[in-house]
């Protein structure tokens, strides 16, 4: 289960977010993006000491400041059910496809099948293609 798929499923559900500086935010998840930046609504912010509280209608939290997220167990169960329903876990699709990696034979990535010299002779850097029967410089 990937963290971002968990967050996408948790939209419109309550969650607790603790930041690296010790502050906590309790609210309902509105949205999240690929960098785990999140928007919360109906937020209660608690100071790191736990002695001050603020109520906010909405709040934006940068993903890189998050220490951890506490999400209800029912959300985790929903994500597990989605993974089973899709029938894919780690490597599910890759095992069905033909894999072309190291040691699997085939031509690989290069056109001529290897490294170094051994391509078409006479086509070096900036040199015209050599044609038999003509000398360079004489017309």
From Swiss-Prot:
| GO cellular-component term (any) | nucleoplasm
- SUPFAM superfamilies per the record? Sm-like ribonucleoproteins
**Compositionally biased tracts (Gly residues):** 102-125
Quick check: keyword Nucleus in the entry? yes
Q: Cystine bridges: which residues?
A: none
Supply one GO BP term.
RNA splicing
Can you provide one Gene Ontology molecular function annotated for this UniProt record?
U6 snRNA binding
Which portions of the sequence form the region Disordered? Answer: 87-139
Note the position of the cross-link Glycyl lysine isopeptide (Lys-Gly) (interchain with G-Cter in SUMO2). 80
Segments forming domain Sm: 2-75
Query: Could you tell me the keywords of this UniProt record?
Result: Acetylation, Isopeptide bond, mRNA processing, mRNA splicing, Nucleus, Ribonucleoprotein, RNA-binding, Spliceosome, Ubl conjugation
Homology family:
Belongs to the snRNP Sm proteins family.
Assembly behavior: Component of the precatalytic spliceosome (spliceosome B complex). Component of the U4/U6-U5 tri-snRNP complex, a building block of the precatalytic spliceosome (spliceosome B complex). The U4/U6-U5 tri-snRNP complex is composed of the U4, U6 and U5 snRNAs and at least PRPF3, PRPF4, PRPF6, PRPF8, PRPF31, SNRNP200, TXNL4A, SNRNP40, SNRPB, SNRPD1, SNRPD2, SNRPD3, SNRPE, SNRPF, SNRPG, DDX23, CD2BP2, PPIH, SNU13, EFTUD2, SART1 and USP39, plus LSM2, LSM3, LSM4, LSM5, LSM6, LSM7 and LSM8.
Q: What does this protein do?
A: Plays a role in pre-mRNA splicing as component of the U4/U6-U5 tri-snRNP complex that is involved in spliceosome assembly, and as component of the precatalytic spliceosome (spliceosome B complex). The heptameric LSM2-8 complex binds specifically to the 3'-terminal U-tract of U6 snRNA.
**Which protein are we looking at?**
U6 snRNA-associated Sm-like protein LSm4
Organism equals Homo sapiens (Human)
């Amino acid at each position: 289960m990937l963290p971002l798929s968990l967050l996408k499923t948790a939209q419109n559900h309550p969650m607790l977010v603790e930041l690296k500086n010790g502050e906590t935010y309790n609210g309902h998840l509105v949205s999240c993006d690929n960098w785990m930046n999140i928007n919360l609504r109906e937020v209660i912010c608690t100071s790191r000491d736990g002695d001050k509280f603020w109520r906010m209608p909405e709040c934006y939290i940068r993903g890189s400041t998050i220490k951890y997220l506490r999400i209800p167990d029912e959300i985790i169960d929903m994500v597990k059910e989605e993974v089973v329903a899709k029938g894919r876990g780690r490597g599910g699709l890759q095992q069905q496809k033909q894999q072309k990696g190291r040691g699997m034979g085939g031509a690989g990535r290069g056109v001529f099948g290897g490294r170094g010299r051994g391509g078409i002779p006479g086509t070096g850097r900036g040199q015209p293609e050599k044609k038999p029967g003509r000398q360079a410089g004489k017309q």
